[in-house]
Amino acid sequence: MSKRIAGPEIERLIQLLARVPGLGPRSARRAALHLIKKKEALLVPLGGAMQEAAEKVRICSCCGNVDTSDPCTICTDERRDPATLIVVEDVSDLWALERAGTMNVRYHVLGGRLSPLDGIGPDDLNIKGLVERVASGAIKEVILAVNATVEGQTTAHYITDQLSNFDVRVTRLAHGVPVGGELDYLDEGTLAAALRARTTL
């Protein structure tokens, strides 16, 4: 059993920071110390921003993006092409594609990918919402921008099958996205090239 080195409030801060992806216990301790040292410049404003986000952030009922409005800013932007829909696994993938700035379209966030080994099936993802959006008839192309993993490929094939009865072109990102790679880690140039070289399934 390890000794406590600080009061319960600091220990709780460290424990919560350690649950953030990419931060382990050691990094969480360093981050906590940095925040405490910069209390007025960082810790207090960060606490306020987190409280405000907890109160105001919503999941878009149309596409699954996170925003402070529902529908989100992307879904209500009339300058975007309503006939083209990019399907992504997570919001981080949507943000990565937006950073690439190649296409001015709308999105659909699945909320994950099919993974039978992890017990994640079609009903656990926002696939039904995607089918409903395509069934409306306004969408002419669905671009599957899922990760190039085994689970991502499985998800792409399942979605293609679900959309096969609709008059919609289904494409996917070109294989410039490395197998096993995740969109959030790719640079803007790679993402832009992959979007331009997409192929029909």
UniProtKB/Swiss-Prot annotation:
GO terms assigned for molecular function: DNA binding; zinc ion binding
Zinc finger (C4-type) in chain: 60-75
Domain Toprim: 83-178
Zinc-finger recorded as keyword: yes
UniProt cross-references to PROSITE patterns, sorted A to Z: RECR (PS01300), TOPRIM (PS50880)
Cross-referenced SMART domains: TOPRIM (SM00493)
Keywords linked to the UniProt accession: DNA damage, DNA recombination, DNA repair, Metal-binding, Zinc, Zinc-finger
This protein's record includes keyword DNA damage: yes
SUPFAM superfamilies registered for this protein in UniProt: Recombination protein RecR
GO BP field: DNA recombination; DNA repair
Cited PANTHER family: RECOMBINATION PROTEIN RECR
Family, similarity comment: Belongs to the RecR family.
Free-text function comment from the UniProt entry: May play a role in DNA repair. It seems to be involved in an RecBC-independent recombinational process of DNA repair. It may act with RecF and RecO.
Protein name per its UniProtKB record: Recombination protein RecR
Organism: Brucella canis (strain ATCC 23365 / NCTC 10854 / RM-666)
